[in-house]
């Protein structure tokens, strides 16, 4: 999986303990520590300058969000490994159905491509934005010793300027890639889960009584035998669908527990950063400060929307499962089939909604609601 390989390169996902991975982990921890210390010291020395302090705090919160998510991820590393293993098991449940039906196979393949393209696109976008920020001082202020993110007011950037520039740049790239990489991992998982629910919808719709298509000339005795076999096949397929549905719900519950702390961190940080950026953009008299604040908004808002969009797809497909149940050939089915059908009906009636911190629903409605206070 592309997301796992990416996080392994950054030193927070272990694919076998090697000297290389230990070095990668040390670099990740070092970059995270530098981001916190460098930003905190910078805020201390400029405290009292409203506009400059607000701008540095924005940078601090963005970097701090990545460091917090990295710390949570590393602390719960075994649970994330378990999540990956359970996802593989979940994808294998309907592999047989996908191999028999090209349409189902196309849904699965499309979800994998979507997850990979989304991950590549967003990570490259984040990298390009970070590199743009890194290059601004060299292009806009070539004669001044200015650092890309926060300035060292205590020595006016005179001491260790080159080293400070390089470390600030590397730490920004490393931490931002970790922050968005974790978000893309969860988004990719939710895309694959939504695809599994969509495949289940098609399987439920395909449950039908084959006797309905038997020719009228078929003998009555033969028709009864076919009816018995068809009912048995319908019941067996329904049992498999119920088991798959239960396995998907269990996986989503586990995903909820794993994702909740990081999603809550992203929600809180996104709201704080958005409010601070809009506040300074509104009251600042310098146009350059307004542009800087506006450029910051794309990062937290984009990360927040990523969660809401992916989780909404899961909820929508879960609702589609409920609708598909009533569309299968249950009217002329046996009582045994109808009793089994009640199980999946009763469970699918409860909305499948992911939450941040087990408190706030993650969906597009919540995204719009959280943006309203920031615009006021």
Question: Language-model segments: what does each one mean?
Answer:
Residues 1-21, 101-111, 120-129, 138, ...:
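Terminal membrane-anchoring module of integral membrane proteins
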Residues 1-57, 89-190, 195, 199-226, ...:
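Helix-loop-helix junctions within predominantly alpha-helical proteins
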Residues 35-38, 62, 82-85, 89, ...:
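Generic structural signal for well-ordered, non-membrane alpha-helices
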Residues 42-47, 71-79, 248:
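Cytoplasmic, membrane-proximal interface of class
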Residues 52-73:
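Transmembrane alpha-helix/interfacial motif
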Residues 62, 85-92, 96, 198, ...:
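Short amphipathic alpha-helices and their capping/turn residues within compact interaction modules
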Residues 65, 69, 175-178, 182, ...:
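A broad detector of the eukaryotic-type serine/threonine protein kinase catalytic domain
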Residues 69-88, 186-188, 194, 198, ...:
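Inner-leaflet juxtamembrane helices
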